């Protein structure tokens, strides 16, 4: 068994059908050995990283990260989300919703920042969860995150066709054609979306530094168009619209839907801040991770908060909230005003730039996730290779780019959008839990059960709050349960904070107000997960089931073989001492 276990090719289990069948019979023991096996920070930055062959060049600075963060967050969706949340949930107080959502996004970004500073590798959340909870949880979350990236990128690229048509006054149908033999939802061919995806794929394969430069130019143009729309909104707007609806029978005031409306609006617009997580995957290519990563991630979120709040105020001043078009607020508002119809095309141009920037950042991120998952051997090692000339993960970039292009060619936008979001929120939830666990538990030295019990109790309390908020009818019983849940959650955090000491204090940068900051992030992500529809959970369950099958029939055996040949083993005493210095 030991001879079979050790093979320098790393694929002993797949050398023949007979050997593979024998390996399957040993799946339970291999699963128990590998599923919760944690890597170390030093291994991730040295031995595992070396699997790629070449190193990714460290060419990025803090301003590159800020540009990538802004480009990843501010896509075309902001032109729609603001109007929808204002009309349906918050009214003029949508600016408060954006501020609350932005603060919560900043708290979640802090969790990513602590990990990225102390573990500057390209794996992002996959690596963070792998060194905390083990290989199997990391693979489940990483695979779902990559699928969400691919699906959202395909949807965004098809949206580019629509906004480009709006900018030039051309109907989308003139750029797409119908194939009668294909089923509905998959029969509208979009060649422009394919061209855009393949062009972005070429750029990110060629050079990360050049990709950053392209993103900086497009982001600057996009921000210029956003500022233009904001100025137009303020100049044409009326302060009275912040408190008076068009129909006197509708609720009035700055908070027409009350506090609940503000928080419901915050839950909707929070997704507009998603994108900063992709910046963490660039950590391996940052010149000075300790200084540049905190400035890049936090700085980009702060700038986006300001832009979103200004857009929300200008939108609320432009029209009474009950006249806002939920689907195309800015375009509809300006098109109804004599002499201002041309602004509609400006919105289309700005949205087109936003789509390109979000596509560049997301495709950079998805390729680096796949690259590091390949390094861990749970997918073929081919994905881990870094090209010696470009210093980019060309194999992962090209494969995912082609896959995205195929989806964008055939699949309708609505079909894609119904499959996106839950995976990203789930990963945010896992990272917030992981940063607490890493602070309070040192494997082999600290008892993990107090921390695990705390995380479970806090999550259960947050789930109870979310279910009551979503399902219970309004009235005193609902508010009593919500209040009791809030008090219980606060008490749980305070008791944990007082009773359980931190096992590790970050040397360079750490999440402030531990454990309160990540706990707010945990609660928010559970709250947002509770607002998603049933098809989202069905998709998540179905795809997660497929991921489990892949892990059972392939990944656990490939990982087991890699452990046998020493790729994932760790026994060097000198290296152990270096780990202690890194993690102290």
Curated annotation (Swiss-Prot):
Entry keyword Ion transport: no
Location in the cell: Plastid, Chloroplast membrane
Transit peptide: 1-49
Listed transmembrane segments: 62-82, 90-110, 131-151, 185-205, 214-234, 254-274, 293-313, 346-366, 396-416, 417-437, 449-469, 480-500, 508-528, 540-560
Keyword Secreted set for record: no
InterPro entries tied to this protein: AA/rel_permease1, CAT_C
GO process annotations (BP): amino acid transport
GO cellular component, as recorded: chloroplast membrane
Gene3D superfamilies documented for this protein: Amino acid/polyamine transporter I (1.20.1740.10)
One Gene Ontology term of the molecular function aspect: transmembrane transporter activity
Keyword terms of this UniProt record: Amino-acid transport, Chloroplast, Membrane, Plastid, Transit peptide, Transmembrane, Transmembrane helix, Transport
Protein family membership: Belongs to the amino acid-polyamine-organocation (APC) superfamily. Cationic amino acid transporter (CAT) (TC 2.A.3.3) family.
Protein name as it appears in the record: Cationic amino acid transporter 7, chloroplastic
Native source species: Arabidopsis thaliana (Mouse-ear cress)
């Amino acid at each position: 068994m030991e001879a079979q276990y050790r093979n320098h090719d790393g694929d002993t289990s797949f050398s023949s059908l007979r050997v593979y069948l024998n390996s399957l019979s040993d799946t339970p023991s291999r699963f128990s050995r590998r599923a919760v096996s944690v890597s170390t920070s030093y291994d991730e930055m040295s031995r595992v990283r070396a699997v790629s062959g070449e190193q990714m060049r460290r060419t990025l600075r803090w301003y590159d990260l800020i540009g990538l963060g802004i480009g990843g967050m501010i896509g075309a969706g902001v032109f729609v989300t603001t109007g929808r949340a204002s009309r349906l949930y918050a009214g003029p107080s949508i600016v408060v919703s954006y501020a609350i959502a932005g603060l919560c996004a900043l708290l979640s970004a802090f969790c990513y920042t602590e990990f990225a500073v102390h573990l500057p590798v390209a794996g992002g959340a996959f690596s963070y969860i792998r060194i905390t909870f083990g290989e199997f949880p990391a693979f489940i979350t990483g695979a779902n995150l990559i699928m969400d990236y691919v699906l959202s990128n395909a949807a965004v690229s098809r949206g580019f066709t629509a906004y480009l048509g709006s900018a030039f006054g051309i109907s989308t149908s003139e750029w797409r054609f119908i194939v009668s033999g294909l089923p509905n939802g998959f029969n509208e061919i979009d060649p422009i979306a394919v061209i855009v995806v393949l062009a972005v794929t070429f750029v990110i394969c060629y050079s990360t530094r050049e990709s950053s430069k392209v993103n900086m130019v497009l982001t600057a143009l996009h921000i210029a168009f956003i500022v233009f729309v904001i100025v137009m909104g303020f100049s044409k707007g009326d302060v009275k619209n912040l408190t008076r609806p068009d129909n006197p029978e509708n609720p009035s005031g700055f908070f027409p839907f009350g506090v609940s409306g503000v928080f419901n609006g915050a839950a909707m617009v929070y997704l507009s801040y998603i994108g900063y997580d992709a910046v963490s995957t660039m950590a391996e290519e940052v010149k000075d991770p300790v200084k540049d990563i905190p400035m890049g991630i936090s700085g980009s979120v702060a700038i986006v908060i300001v832009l979103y709040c200004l857009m929300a105020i200008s939108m609320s001043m432009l029209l009474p909230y009950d006249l806002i078009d939920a689907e195309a607020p800015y375009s509809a508002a300006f098109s109804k005003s004599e002499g201002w119809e041309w602004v509609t095309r400006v919105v289309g141009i700005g949205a087109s730039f936003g789509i390109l920037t979000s596509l560049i950042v997301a495709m950079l991120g998805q390729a680096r996730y796949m690259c590091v998952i390949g390094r861990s051997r749970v997918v073929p090692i081919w994905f881990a290779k870094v090209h010696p000339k470009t210093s980019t993960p060309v194999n992962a970039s090209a494969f995912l780019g082609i896959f995205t292009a195929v989806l964008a060619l055939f699949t309708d936008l609505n079909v894609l959008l119904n499959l996106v979001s839950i995976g990203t929120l789930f990963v945010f939830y896992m990272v917030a839990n992981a940063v607490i666990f890493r602070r309070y538990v040192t494997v082999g030295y600290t008892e993990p059960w107090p921390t695990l019990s705390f995380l479970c109790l806090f999550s259960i309390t947050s789930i109870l709050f979310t279910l009551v908020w979503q399902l219970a009818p309004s009235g005193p019983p609902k508010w009593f349960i919500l209040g009791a849940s809030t008090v219980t959650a606060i008490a749980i955090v305070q008791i944990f904070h007082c009773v359980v000491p931190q096992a590790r204090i970050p040397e360079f940068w750490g999440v402030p107000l531990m454990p309160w900051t990540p706990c707010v992030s945990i609660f928010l992500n559970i709250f947002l997960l509770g607002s998603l529809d049933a098809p989202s959970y069905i998709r998540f369950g179905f795809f997660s089931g497929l991921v489990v099958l892949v892990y059972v029939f392939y990944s656990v055996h490939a990982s087991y073989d890699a452990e046998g040949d020493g790729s994932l083993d760790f026994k060097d005493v000198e290296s152990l001492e270096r780990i202690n210095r890194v993690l102290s």
